[in-house]
Structures are given as C-alpha cells and as structure tokens.
C-alpha cells in the first residue's frame, strides 16, 4: 500500500518541475476551461456524431448522423476506443489498397481488466491531498484528490479471461452494483473501507479496460490520435495526457508545412509525409509508455508469481518514485514548438529534468536503490523462466 500527501508535494515539486503548481480537476472542468479560452467558438460543433468518412486524393468528406456534410483537407479522429474514424480508415484502406491493414490488427484490441470508477464527497479518514494505491491479488484501488476534498477513485480488477475485440461487452448498472458489493468490506487506508467510499459516492460506473497500441495510425487523409489508436489502462494516468500530446505533435507538423508552403495549398504527398512522420515518432514514444502501463497494471494487481512477490515485498517500499517517474514521462513529451514557451515552464520543465532528481524534490537515494533492486530481481527471475 502506498500513500502520498500530494497536496504538500505539489506545492513544493510542481513549480520546480513544471513551472506552475499542480492542479487536479475533472475532464469536464478542463474542457470548460479550454472552450472558454477559445476566441472563435463557431468552429466547435456539438451533437455531430460522425457516421461516414470518404478519403480521396484531393479532398476528404465526413457525414454526420443528422445529415450534415463537411469537406476539408484532413480528418483527425480523437473519438475514443470505439472509434468511427479508425473503422472508416480501415474501410478506406481495404477498398483502395486491400491487405494494407492486416486482419490481425483489426482484432488486436483486448481487455484483461475491468474498472469501476467513481467520485465521492470527502471521506473521513482520508486527508485532503492524499493519494493512495492499495494493492490486492488481482485488484488495485487508486484514490486521488479532487476539488474541495472530494475523491476520485478506481477499482481495477482482473477479469476471469481475456476478451478480444469485438467480444468486449459493456457492463450494466446491475454488474456495477454487484461488483461494488463484493468489494465493500475491503480496507483502503487505515480504518477506511471501500464501502465508506461507496456510501459517499455521487457517481459510479464500470467499464472494461481495453489495451492496445495499433500499428496503423494513418491512411490517406485520415489520422487517429488518443484512445482511438493507443489505449492504455489508467494506472499510470497517461491516457488523456498522451492524447493531448498527439494533438500538439500533429499541430507542429501541420504548422511547419503551412509555414513552408506559404499561400500554396499543401499537396497530398506533403500531407502524407507529415502524417507519416508524426505516426512514426509518436508511436515510438507510445510503445515505451505502453510497456510501462502494462507492467505497472500487473504489478499493482500482483498478477502472477513475480508481480505478487515484487508487489508484496518491494513495491510498497518504493516511496515516491511513482510520482517522480511520472513527472519525467510527462517532461519527455512533445510541446507546441511554434508558440513561445513561458519562462516558468522553460526553466522548470526543461532545465530541471536535465538534472533529474536534483531540484526542489529530489528522488530519495533509498527509492533509487529499491527500484534498481526491483528491476534486477525481475530480470533475474525472467532469465530463469
């Protein structure tokens, strides 16, 4: 079991590493902030579910459920794990270049875990700002602070078998309630049990946790980003972050192309070059994050003999390494390179990570040694299997 007093650490480490204090907010709040800051809101169309995309060499056209039609140069799909954009990209490739998308890729999405997530009002026994990871065999509780002492939480549990797309069914409210009741009496932190969170929960749902890094990210004038092409579990909390990174990296490539072309319309081949370069570089980064996410998910749920041993006897002694390593992962991501970087970020995010662990919140030497020991044990055990 791990617990951080995030409220105190974010005041000290946040400005040193990122240039600004760390703030915790819901995705809805983030979207509201971003939307409010838009100078031209007319380009944001809500209630426009895309049902069809036709990609041609000179143009691309999308049709929505309400009959609207939009024509342009490029479609970037950030429409989640059940992506219509991805399906339409596959359809276009199958029609225009049969065999370009391998059949095994279309069935590479799978789920081995489920996740119950919820938002609770302040729970007595959990102090404001505390972030908790509680591990059991085949089960992990993640509790993190939100605004005004409220708590966001995940209960991530190993499924009885691996489900492969399209055999990944959603869970009903009845499934959610039954699973919650089965976990109600499990301790979370000191005298706090999972049932104490449930009693104060305002919203709760259950979903399968799909995992996959697709091979093909773009075809024609179609590009996929975020969960539509790279689906992580929430254990390392990088799903939304990497989707935003993807949008930034695409914007960098397009800005460079438009700046180079001036008033000339980008050609089909030029757009292909930008999309291909983006897919290659971002997929390389995501491959590393997928490996980390896969490993952490199974370590925290103590899946298998190795993870059970490491999870019980080593992981709980690694201190704040997760906090620091997550910060380093974020620092290595792309940023918008055509906007001036605020001085605070330039100093905090770039310079401090060049000397990782030597700024205002250095990683304890005991933690470093513990992590080296953990990795050594894992490598040795795997070498004899």
Curated annotation (Swiss-Prot):
This is FAD-dependent monooxygenase verC2. GO terms for biological process: terpenoid biosynthetic process. Keywords: FAD, Flavoprotein, Glycoprotein, Membrane, Oxidoreductase, Transmembrane, Transmembrane helix. It is an enzyme of class 1 (oxidoreductase). It is a single-pass membrane protein. Gene3D superfamilies: FAD/NAD(P)-binding domain. GO terms for molecular function: FAD binding; monooxygenase activity. It is found in: Membrane. Pathway: Secondary metabolite biosynthesis; terpenoid biosynthesis; Mycotoxin biosynthesis. Its EC number is 1.-.-.-. FAD binds at residues 27, 227, 240. The chain crosses the membrane at residues 365-385. The keyword Transport does not apply. Belongs to the paxM FAD-dependent monooxygenase family.
């Amino acid at each position: 079991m791990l617990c951080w007093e995030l409220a105190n650490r974010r005041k000290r480490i946040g400005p040193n590493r990122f240039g600004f204090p760390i703030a915790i907010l819901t995705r809805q709040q983030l979207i509201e902030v971003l939307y409010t800051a838009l100078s031209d809101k007319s380009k944001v169309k809500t209630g426009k579910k895309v049902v069809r995309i036709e990609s041609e060499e000179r143009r691309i056209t999308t049709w929505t459920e309400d009959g609207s039609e939009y024509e342009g140069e490029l479609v970037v799909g950030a429409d989640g794990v059940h992506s219509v954009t991805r399906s339409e990209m596959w359809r276009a490739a199958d029609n225009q270049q049969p065999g370009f998308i391998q059949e095994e890729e279309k069935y590479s999405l799978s789920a081995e875990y489920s996740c119950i997530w919820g938002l609770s009002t302040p729970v007595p026994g959990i102090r404001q700002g505390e972030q908790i990871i509680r591990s059991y065999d085949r089960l992990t509780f993640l509790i993190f602070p939100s605004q005004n002492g409220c708590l966001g939480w995940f209960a991530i549990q190993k499924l009885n078998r691996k489900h492969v797309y399209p055999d990944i069914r959603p869970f009903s409210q009845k499934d959610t309630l039954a699973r919650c009741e089965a976990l109600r009496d499990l301790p979370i932190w000191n005298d706090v049990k999972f049932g104490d969170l449930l009693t104060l929960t305002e919203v709760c749902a259950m979903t399968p946790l799909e995992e996959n890094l697709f091979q093909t990210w773009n075809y024609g004038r179609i590009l996929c980003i975020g969960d539509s092409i790279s689906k992580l579990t929430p254990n390392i909390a990088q799903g939304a972050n990497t989707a935003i990174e993807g949008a930034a990296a695409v914007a960098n490539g397009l800005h460079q192309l438009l700046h180079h072309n001036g008033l000339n319309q980008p050609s089909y081949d030029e757009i292909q070059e930008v999309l291909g370069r983006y897919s290659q570089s971002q997929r390389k980064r995501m491959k590393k994050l997928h490996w980390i996410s896969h490993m952490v998910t199974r370590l925290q749920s103590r899946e298998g003999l190795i993870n059970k041993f490491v999870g019980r006897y080593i992981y709980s002694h690694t201190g704040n390494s997760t906090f620091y390593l997550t910060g380093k992962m974020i620092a290595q991501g792309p940023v918008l390179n055509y906007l001036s970087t605020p001085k605070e970020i330039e100093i905090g995010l770039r310079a401090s990570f060049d000397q990782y662990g030597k700024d205002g919140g250095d990683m304890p030497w005991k933690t470093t040694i513990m992590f080296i020991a953990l990795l050594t044990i894992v490598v040795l055990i795997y070498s004899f299997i």
